[in-house]
Amino acid sequence: MSTFGYRRELSKYEDIDEDELLASLTEEELKELERELEDIEPDRNLPVGQRQKSLTEKTPTGTFSREALMAYWERETRKLLEKERLGACEKDSEQEEDNSEDIQEECFTESNSEVSEEAYTEEDDEEEEEEEEEEEDEDDSDDEDEEKQNSAASERPVNCEDGRSSSHVRHKKCSNAKNSENLFNGHDGKDTENLSFKSSAIHPCGNPTVIEDALEKVRSNDPETTEVNLNNIENITSQMLIQFSQALRDNTVVKSFSLANTHADDNVAIAIAGMLKVNQHITSLNIESNFITGKGVLAIMRALQHNKVLTELRFHNQRHIMGSQVEMDIVKLLKENTTLVKLGYHFDLAGPRMSMTSILTRNMDKQRQKRMQEQRQQEYGCDGAINPKTKVLQKGTPRSSPYTSPKSSPWSSPKLPRKSAPAKSQPPAPAPPPPPPPPPPPPPPPPPVIPDKKAPTRNIAEVIKQQESSRKALQNGQKKKKGKKGKKHENSILKEIKDSLKSVSDRKSEEGSRPSTRPSTPQRSLHDNLMEAIRASSIKQLRRVEVPEALR
């Protein structure tokens, strides 16, 4: 029934003219019809990725302009690059960012998407031409006038973009001027040094160190500056770092020198190595996150062979990889170093890593032993300072004992009448009695009695040797007798049974074994006696006996 109903519905459209329907459709409806037909039956000649209709074609919902956003991103990236290379001032950057944000907001709110696309395409061409002219002429006023004339005929978004381009040009000129002031060429002498001071004094990082003042303090050997911290000062030049290392050669106060993330290179590392050979006061050095290669690191390691004070060295996270050869050379150079305790570097190879840990543990153990020795010496020194007082007290303390001793001891009675005549108030005279106590120490002489006991041991050894020689003679005689008996009873079965019951020593003697180098053992034993009794007896003569404890 369903098929009949479906055919009836189709029969309604048999009389309809398709050409008239297509002629009555509008352009939008025709486009929609084409899309539907493409979805139903796509073109087989197209690749699979292009047969599906585009699902990203949507009408813009706001006043967004892609070209304006791309131009803004390009300007920001240029600003960041200029800041990294030249070290632009913080104030100028903040003002320019505020101006660019205001201009960007106006452009986004006042420009339509379609109009802005056409306008910005024209603006891009104009900006390129203007920048080329500005680079050649370097005249700000003429460029601004040309921008105003070119933008007068265009719409407001064009004016907005021209304003932004002019601000960008101003920023570029300002940065070029700063570049000419701050760059250090190395050919200007004192003027270039002053310019380098200006460039390094102004830095956007969070390090509050003033480079000029710090360098002056290091050169003047200021007793208050025990640490020089130049971390994260990115716009400091390598020449300034070399000057710091040269100033530290004669400094005797600074204990810590750190210049992490300062773009230091091998030249700075070589200067630091020369400083470490001379300076014997710096205990901590930090050169992490720089551009130092294996050449500079090895130069510092060679300098440590002449330095016996540095205890901490950090050079991890360099721009260039050290490599396996450099790591092995580092370990070789630090084998003889006995002061380095902390090393801030992660070795990639397991061999150098393990050997370096053993070196550091060895150095820590040596320093611990030194501390223990110093403590002991201090304790002994304190005891030595106290000993004279104790001796005086000991001399004074026995004076209290003689007061009671003369009343009872016979020694003091004859001495009192002799010394009582010159002065009665001289009880210290009995001080000699303390020597009598030393006689008790003579009991230690008993240890010499030990050598008296050794004398009889020699006699015992001689007796033992005589006994062994007699036993050997007996054994040799027995061996000869047993050999004769064995020859007589070779063919008898009874002899084989008896041989099976013989001991190992008897078998070896019969077979003519070589004499052993070991000391001779007693010939007869309980086992041998038992075996002889068994051989000489018969079954009738045997009787039951208890097994001795030695054989249980």
Swiss-Prot record:
GO BP annotation list: actin filament organization; actin filament polymerization; muscle contraction; myofibril assembly; pointed-end actin filament capping
InterPro entries: LRR_dom_sf (IPR032675), TMOD (IPR004934), WH2_dom (IPR003124)
Record protein name field: Leiomodin-2
Amino acid composition bias (Low complexity), ranges on this chain: 398-415
Compositionally biased tracts (Polar residues): 51-64, 514-524
Comp. bias intervals (Basic residues): 478-488
Stated role: Mediates nucleation of actin filaments and thereby promotes actin polymerization. Plays a role in the regulation of actin filament length. Required for normal sarcomere organization in the heart, and for normal heart function.
Annotated segments matching region Interaction with actin 3: 526-545
Region of interest called Interaction with tropomyosin alpha, as start-end residue ranges on this chain: 1-47
Domain WH2 residue range list: 526-545
Region (Interaction with actin 1): 1-169
Subunit structure: Can bind at least three actin monomers and thereby provides a nucleus for actin filament formation. Interacts (via N-terminus) with tropomyosin alpha (TPM1) (via N-terminus). May also interact with TPM2 (via N-terminus).
Protein family: Belongs to the tropomodulin family.
Origin superkingdom: Eukaryota
Gene3D superfamilies: Ribonuclease Inhibitor
One of the record's GO cellular component terms: M band
Compositionally biased tracts (Acidic residues): 93-108, 115-147
Biased composition, class Pro residues, residue ranges: 425-450
GO molecular function term, any single one: actin binding
Keyword annotations from UniProtKB, A to Z: Actin-binding, Coiled coil, Cytoplasm, Cytoskeleton
Pfam assignment, any one: Tropomodulin
Region (Interaction with actin 2): 170-498
Coiled coil, from the record: 13-46, 86-151
Organism: Gallus gallus
